[in-house]
Protein backbone atom coordinates (compact mmCIF):
# COMPACT_ATOMS: atom_id res chain seq x y z
CA UNK A 1 0.00 0.00 0.00
CA UNK A 2 1.40 3.40 -1.00
CA UNK A 3 0.30 6.23 1.26
CA UNK A 4 0.30 9.41 -0.82
CA UNK A 5 1.54 12.18 1.47
CA UNK A 6 2.35 14.63 -1.31
CA UNK A 7 0.99 16.26 -4.47
CA UNK A 8 -1.64 18.31 -2.64
CA UNK A 9 -3.65 15.38 -1.31
CA UNK A 10 -5.09 15.19 2.21
CA UNK A 11 -1.91 14.27 4.11
CA UNK A 12 -0.03 16.99 2.26
CA UNK A 13 -2.68 19.54 3.20
CA UNK A 14 -2.29 18.67 6.87
CA UNK A 15 1.51 18.93 6.62
CA UNK A 16 1.53 22.30 4.84
CA UNK A 17 1.94 25.29 7.16
CA UNK A 18 0.11 27.65 4.79
CA UNK A 19 -2.87 25.36 4.23
CA UNK A 20 -3.33 23.79 7.65
CA UNK A 21 -4.78 26.59 9.78
CA UNK A 22 -6.16 24.32 12.49
CA UNK A 23 -5.67 25.32 16.12
CA UNK A 24 -6.10 21.87 17.66
CA UNK A 25 -3.63 18.99 18.01
CA UNK A 26 -3.48 18.62 14.22
CA UNK A 27 -2.34 22.16 13.45
CA UNK A 28 0.31 24.71 14.34
CA UNK A 29 3.70 23.10 14.96
CA UNK A 30 5.36 20.77 12.47
CA UNK A 31 4.81 17.95 14.93
CA UNK A 32 1.09 18.62 15.04
CA UNK A 33 0.82 19.07 11.28
CA UNK A 34 2.52 15.70 10.79
CA UNK A 35 0.20 13.97 13.24
CA UNK A 36 -2.48 13.00 10.70
CA UNK A 37 0.05 11.50 8.27
CA UNK A 38 1.74 9.50 11.01
CA UNK A 39 -1.47 8.31 12.65
CA UNK A 40 -2.73 7.12 9.28
CA UNK A 41 0.59 5.40 8.63
CA UNK A 42 0.50 3.67 12.00
CA UNK A 43 -3.04 2.44 11.33
CA UNK A 44 -2.04 0.93 7.99
CA UNK A 45 1.06 -0.64 9.53
CA UNK A 46 -1.08 -2.18 12.27
CA UNK A 47 -3.31 -3.71 9.62
CA UNK A 48 -0.77 -5.13 7.15
CA UNK A 49 2.75 -4.63 8.55
CA UNK A 50 5.39 -1.97 7.88
CA UNK A 51 7.17 -3.89 5.13
CA UNK A 52 4.02 -3.74 3.00
CA UNK A 53 3.64 0.03 3.29
CA UNK A 54 5.39 2.79 1.33
CA UNK A 55 4.95 6.55 1.18
CA UNK A 56 5.30 9.31 -1.35
CA UNK A 57 6.17 12.92 -0.49
CA UNK A 58 6.64 16.10 -2.55
CA UNK A 59 8.48 18.46 -0.16
CA UNK A 60 8.85 21.23 -2.76
CA UNK A 61 5.41 20.67 -4.23
CA UNK A 62 2.92 23.36 -5.19
CA UNK A 63 0.17 21.25 -6.75
CA UNK A 64 -3.13 23.03 -6.05
CA UNK A 65 -1.73 24.71 -2.94
CA UNK A 66 1.07 27.11 -1.90
CA UNK A 67 4.59 26.07 -1.05
CA UNK A 68 5.18 25.24 2.61
CA UNK A 69 6.86 28.07 4.54
CA UNK A 70 9.75 25.86 5.66
CA UNK A 71 9.86 22.63 3.64
CA UNK A 72 13.19 21.44 5.01
CA UNK A 73 12.04 21.67 8.62
CA UNK A 74 8.56 20.30 7.97
CA UNK A 75 9.52 17.30 5.90
CA UNK A 76 12.73 16.47 7.71
CA UNK A 77 10.63 15.94 10.82
CA UNK A 78 8.01 13.83 9.04
CA UNK A 79 10.62 11.69 7.30
CA UNK A 80 12.56 11.25 10.52
CA UNK A 81 9.43 9.77 12.06
CA UNK A 82 8.77 7.60 9.01
CA UNK A 83 12.34 6.28 9.23
CA UNK A 84 11.61 4.88 12.70
CA UNK A 85 8.79 2.73 11.35
CA UNK A 86 10.69 0.52 8.91
CA UNK A 87 8.46 0.94 5.87
CA UNK A 88 9.17 -0.64 2.48
CA UNK A 89 10.36 2.58 0.85
CA UNK A 90 9.81 6.32 0.51
CA UNK A 91 9.48 8.03 -2.89
CA UNK A 92 10.39 11.73 -3.05
CA UNK A 93 9.31 14.00 -5.89
CA UNK A 94 12.04 16.16 -7.39
CA UNK A 95 11.60 19.93 -6.89
CA UNK A 96 11.85 20.53 -10.64
CA UNK A 97 8.59 18.80 -11.46
CA UNK A 98 4.97 19.90 -11.17
CA UNK A 99 1.69 18.54 -12.44
CA UNK A 100 0.71 21.77 -14.18
CA UNK A 101 3.91 23.83 -14.56
CA UNK A 102 6.90 23.50 -16.85
CA UNK A 103 10.26 22.79 -15.26
CA UNK A 104 11.49 26.33 -15.96
CA UNK A 105 8.43 27.93 -14.38
CA UNK A 106 8.64 25.65 -11.33
CA UNK A 107 12.28 26.56 -10.72
CA UNK A 108 11.51 30.26 -11.17
CA UNK A 109 8.70 30.05 -8.62
CA UNK A 110 10.96 28.33 -6.08
CA UNK A 111 13.69 30.93 -6.54
CA UNK A 112 11.14 33.73 -6.19
CA UNK A 113 9.91 32.21 -2.92
CA UNK A 114 13.46 32.36 -1.56
CA UNK A 115 13.94 35.96 -2.69
CA UNK A 116 10.67 37.29 -1.30
CA UNK A 117 11.03 35.40 1.97
CA UNK A 118 7.85 33.37 1.65
CA UNK A 119 9.93 30.20 2.03
CA UNK A 120 12.74 29.57 4.51
CA UNK A 121 15.52 28.09 2.37
CA UNK A 122 18.54 28.99 0.28
CA UNK A 123 18.53 28.42 -3.46
CA UNK A 124 21.29 25.83 -3.15
CA UNK A 125 19.17 23.90 -0.63
CA UNK A 126 16.34 23.29 -3.09
CA UNK A 127 17.01 19.60 -3.63
CA UNK A 128 16.23 16.27 -1.99
CA UNK A 129 19.46 15.85 -0.04
CA UNK A 130 18.13 17.07 3.35
CA UNK A 131 15.26 14.60 3.13
CA UNK A 132 17.34 11.71 1.83
CA UNK A 133 19.62 12.21 4.84
CA UNK A 134 16.72 11.47 7.18
CA UNK A 135 16.18 8.05 5.56
CA UNK A 136 19.23 6.19 6.79
CA UNK A 137 17.85 2.66 6.48
CA UNK A 138 14.65 3.18 4.50
CA UNK A 139 15.03 2.58 0.73
CA UNK A 140 14.89 5.90 -1.11
CA UNK A 141 13.18 6.34 -4.49
CA UNK A 142 12.70 9.50 -6.50
CA UNK A 143 10.41 10.61 -9.29
CA UNK A 144 9.92 13.66 -11.48
CA UNK A 145 11.75 14.93 -14.53
CA UNK A 146 13.67 11.76 -15.32
CA UNK A 147 14.19 10.40 -18.81
CA UNK A 148 16.25 7.71 -20.49
CA UNK A 149 19.46 9.68 -20.02
CA UNK A 150 19.39 11.10 -16.49
CA UNK A 151 17.85 8.12 -14.70
CA UNK A 152 21.06 6.30 -13.82
CA UNK A 153 23.49 8.70 -12.13
CA UNK A 154 21.91 9.08 -8.69
CA UNK A 155 21.43 5.33 -8.35
CA UNK A 156 24.97 4.60 -9.52
CA UNK A 157 26.32 7.10 -6.97
CA UNK A 158 24.34 5.42 -4.21
CA UNK A 159 22.25 8.53 -3.50
CA UNK A 160 19.04 6.70 -4.38
CA UNK A 161 18.00 3.07 -4.44
CA UNK A 162 15.82 3.55 -7.53
CA UNK A 163 14.08 6.16 -9.64
CA UNK A 164 10.53 5.87 -10.91
CA UNK A 165 8.61 6.88 -14.01
CA UNK A 166 4.95 7.80 -14.40
CA UNK A 167 4.11 9.99 -17.39
CA UNK A 168 6.61 8.30 -19.72
CA UNK A 169 4.75 5.01 -19.29
CA UNK A 170 1.69 6.48 -21.00
CA UNK A 171 3.41 7.20 -24.31
CA UNK A 172 5.85 4.31 -24.12
CA UNK A 173 4.39 0.84 -23.52
CA UNK A 174 7.92 -0.47 -24.08
CA UNK A 175 9.57 2.10 -21.79
CA UNK A 176 12.03 -0.27 -20.12
CA UNK A 177 13.24 -1.65 -23.44
CA UNK A 178 13.62 1.84 -24.90
CA UNK A 179 15.75 2.96 -21.98
CA UNK A 180 17.85 -0.19 -22.20
CA UNK A 181 18.52 0.41 -25.90
CA UNK A 182 18.88 4.18 -25.61
CA UNK A 183 15.94 4.87 -27.93
CA UNK A 184 14.08 8.17 -28.11
CA UNK A 185 11.03 8.31 -25.85
CA UNK A 186 7.58 9.25 -27.13
CA UNK A 187 5.91 12.27 -25.55
CA UNK A 188 2.38 11.67 -24.27
CA UNK A 189 -0.56 13.62 -25.64
CA UNK A 190 -1.57 15.73 -22.65
CA UNK A 191 -4.99 16.51 -24.14
CA UNK A 192 -6.02 12.85 -24.09
CA UNK A 193 -4.34 11.76 -20.85
CA UNK A 194 -7.46 12.21 -18.75
CA UNK A 195 -10.07 11.49 -21.43
CA UNK A 196 -12.40 8.50 -21.64
CA UNK A 197 -11.58 5.46 -23.73
CA UNK A 198 -8.31 3.97 -24.98
CA UNK A 199 -7.48 6.73 -27.48
CA UNK A 200 -4.30 8.51 -26.43
CA UNK A 201 -3.98 6.23 -23.44
CA UNK A 202 -3.41 2.60 -24.41
CA UNK A 203 -2.90 2.91 -28.17
CA UNK A 204 0.65 4.27 -28.31
CA UNK A 205 2.98 2.27 -30.61
CA UNK A 206 6.15 0.53 -29.51
CA UNK A 207 9.56 1.57 -30.81
CA UNK A 208 10.75 5.00 -31.86
CA UNK A 209 8.10 7.25 -33.36
CA UNK A 210 9.34 9.37 -36.26
Predicted feature residues:
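Flavin-dependent oxidoreductase catalytic cores
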Residues: 1-210
Amino acid sequence: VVQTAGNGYLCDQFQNSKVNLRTDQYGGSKENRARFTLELLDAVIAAIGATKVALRFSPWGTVLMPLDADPISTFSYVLGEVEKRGVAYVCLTQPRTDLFLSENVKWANLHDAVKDGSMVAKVEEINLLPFEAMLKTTPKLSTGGYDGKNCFEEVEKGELDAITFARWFIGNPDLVEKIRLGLRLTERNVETTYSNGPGGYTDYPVGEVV
